């Protein structure tokens, strides 16, 4: 995923939330995404852990 991609994020206790990627930072353990959400328009960081499906919080949104 890259900047300006439409995504959904997994948050505690609720459905996936739509957002837009503002920044991407790669690390050896995974990738961090700064995602703009309705409640956080300036963005909040989410970490996708490499190699662990339970550690994936940001996914590309399906195209309509």
Curated annotation (Swiss-Prot):
Domain of life: Bacteria
Entry's family note: Belongs to the DsrB family.
Protein name (database record): Protein DsrB
Organism: Salmonella arizonae (strain ATCC BAA-731 / CDC346-86 / RSK2980)
Parts of the chain that traverse the membrane: none
InterPro entries: Dextransucrase_DSRB
NCBIfam families assigned to the protein according to its UniProt record, in alphabetical order: PRK10708.1
């Amino acid at each position: 995923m890259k900047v300006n991609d439409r995504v959904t994020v997994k948050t505690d206790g609720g459905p996936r939330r739509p957002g837009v990627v503002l920044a991407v930072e790669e690390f050896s353990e995974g990738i961090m995404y700064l995602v703009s959400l309705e409640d956080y328009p300036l963005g909040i960081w989410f970490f996708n852990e490499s190699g662990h499906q339970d550690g994936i919080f940001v996914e590309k949104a399906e195209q309509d």
